Amino acid sequence: MQLFSILNELILVPILKLKILTMQKHLFLGVEAIGQGAIDGGMSGVYSYPGTPSTEITEFIQENQIAEERNIHRKWSANEKTALETALGMSYAGKRAMSCMKHVGLNVAADIFVNAAMTGVNGGLVVTVADDPSMHSSQNEQDSRFYGKFAMIPVLEPSSQQEAYDMARDGFALSELTKVPVMLRITTRLAHSRAGVARKDVLPENELVMPTDPRQFILLPAIARRKYKGLLESQSLFLKLSEESEYNRYEEGTDHSLGIVACGIAYNYLMEHFPGGTCPFSVVKVSQYPLPENYINRLDQECDEILVLEEGAPMVEEMLKGFFSNGTPIKGRLDGTLPRDGELNPDIVAKALGKEMFEGFDIPDVVANRPPALCVGCGHQDAYLAMNEALADYSKGRVFSDIGCYTLGALPPYETISSCVDMGASITMAKGAADAGLIPAVAMIGDSTFAHSGITGLLDAVNEKSSITIVISDNESISMTGGQDSSAYGRIESICIGVGVDPAHIHTIVPLKKNHEEMVRLFREEFAYNGVSVIIPRRECIQRASSRKRNKK
């Protein structure tokens, strides 16, 4: 009897508690739903680099109790390329893995992303990419679905938080079935809005199992040619799975003057105008790609014209223009029915449907524009003030910046920087400008961005003895995305020395008002130096320092 009681406490009670927990509905952000879905899907590791709007997926997993109990890998990677490569390594060993990034991060990971479709997977691999239409915190609003189409892998695009959870949970099984990585593509609004989500059973993790084909992950040309043919032959399976997917469906309407293709969250926007859940027009809901040709053909046969609702670029709209042979008119972003750029929203969809749309009110002139600004007390402020004074004797346009909080140095009162293009471009653009004769040229880069993509540019500059000064503004965290730990923490000087920078021209200083004159002197000396120099203004992010002090109380 005592043995039964012990077994009951150790086995039955935890199982029942977990069952009750998973039956409950949870109010999740889209990013949280994906994190929970990945955990419940038997994931063994998540590999990511912070980037809005994807950051909170990994943060949710880092703080999750089940992830802690299972010891799921959940540390940040140096960049998106290393993240996805490491996730593929876990897949190689038979475990399920997820890699998360924002849309421009996929540019960084493009090499491994495309080639992973060729190698295929062993354990399930889900690549979650968060797009940012309207560029709320990004350089562009590129549509990651094109990458999925280019790599010829299945793409999942949820229309709701519940689908985001389900796709994250079941995406590993789809990856193992198709033997390729699966992309899970979301956008900002779905990532950062809440809805009720019903959890399902928590699946066990995979056992460590080596690939059955010892050459599966060796892309020598002779093997790669065979693998590529196999990927092409798999397209019919991917199409079949898409046509049979629970996420794609045909909703019959009574008014055939218009047919609608609604992709991902655009389906949600469409149905907001039909509270009863019945749209008078026939609708093809698309949340899994490749496009379900059976439903698309039926819509073409039954409807006079087609309206395509999709968040991002007109990818499906362009495909349909070449898909239909009978000249069915297609409306969407390309013909002006919908705006060519920016986010979709329910009001824009209403206008496309011929419904009344509330235009809103003009902002009164008395309301002052309030652009983002560096935090009061931020170390970047002191660095820019000193840099501006040291550069006063030179012409403008010499400071090449990077991606981070310090990009706000483009705005008043500093107006220091002249570029912000992509991660790591500060050093390489400064080198190119110096090669063209713009001397001195200055690169402004953060500590985490330096680790992400700046080291190779520094190596180029050292190899050619370029006349550039690199300012690595070190706030000891990835502050712009929430204060995550930087991969370069405590290592910047060692990295610079290891790459070949002369230690005599590596300087570290605390960016404070009391050190202003010393900073100006350092900048002036190194701007005049004919070679590579590095100045590291180091002070903890003011927001992170405040948070740390609050947590101590």
Q: Where are each of the predicted segments found?
A:
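Flexible, low-complexity linker and terminal segments
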Residues: 10, 14, 19-31, 41, ...
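Thiamine diphosphate
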Residues: 14, 19-161, 189, 253, 410-534, 542-550, ...
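Short helix-loop-beta junction
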Residues: 62-67, 271-283, 494-502
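Short beta-strand segments
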Residues: 100-101, 126-130, 183-187, 261-262, ...
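Short helix/loop capping segments that flank catalytic or ligand/cofactor-binding pockets
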Residues: 109, 136-138, 192-195, 268-272, ...
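Short secondary-structure boundary/capping segments
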Residues: 142-146, 198-203, 276-277, 322-325, ...
